């Protein structure tokens, strides 16, 4: 493996990085094949629509979000999930402040380079 995180991650030890207006993220566990990222949104913040070649699965830890993926828009809440196919345009709008747990395969090397 070229890149790999430590075995344990502690929120208090991981730097929050700016990911847009009202959005911050922490890079959690990763290796070449997989990555987990915690993303915190303020109410009204937008995850700008974008594409990437990675498969993405998102778990809504808290809050309420309007997600659009592959041309379909739905409201998701704590406990819900969203799947984004590789190369598909997707984004979200935060309706109530919350946290998303994003997983990517393969890992987002562009994220690790910023930490």
Model region roles, listed by residue range:
Residues 64-66, 73, 89, 99:
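Structural motif
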Residues 71-86:
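Short acidic-glycine-tyrosine-enriched beta hairpin
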Residues 61-62, 77-78, 96:
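A cytosolic small-molecule/anion-sensing beta-strand core signal
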Residues 37-51:
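Conserved short histidine dyad/triad with adjacent acidic residue
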Residues 46-47, 66, 82, 86-91:
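Histidine-centered metal-chelating micro-motifs
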Residues 54-65, 70:
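Glycine- and acidic-residue-biased ligand/ion/polar-headgroup-sensing regions
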Residues 1-33:
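A short, N-terminal "cap"/entry segment at the start of jelly-roll beta-barrel domains
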Residues 86-110:
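Ligand-binding loop in jelly-roll beta-barrel domains
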């Amino acid at each position: 493996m070229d890149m790999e995180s430590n075995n344990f991650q502690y929120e208090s030890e991981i730097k929050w990085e700016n990911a847009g207006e009202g959005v911050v993220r922490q890079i959690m566990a990763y290796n070449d094949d997989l990555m987990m990222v915690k993303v915190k949104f303020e109410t009204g913040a937008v995850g700008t629509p974008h594409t990437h070649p990675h498969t993405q699965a998102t778990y809504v830890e808290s809050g309420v979000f309007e997600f659009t993926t592959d041309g379909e828009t739905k409201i998701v809440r704590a406990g819900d999930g969203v799947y984004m196919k590789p190369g598909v345009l997707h984004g979200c709008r935060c309706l109530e402040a919350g946290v998303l747990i994003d997983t990517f395969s393969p890992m987002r090397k562009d994220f690790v380079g910023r930490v």
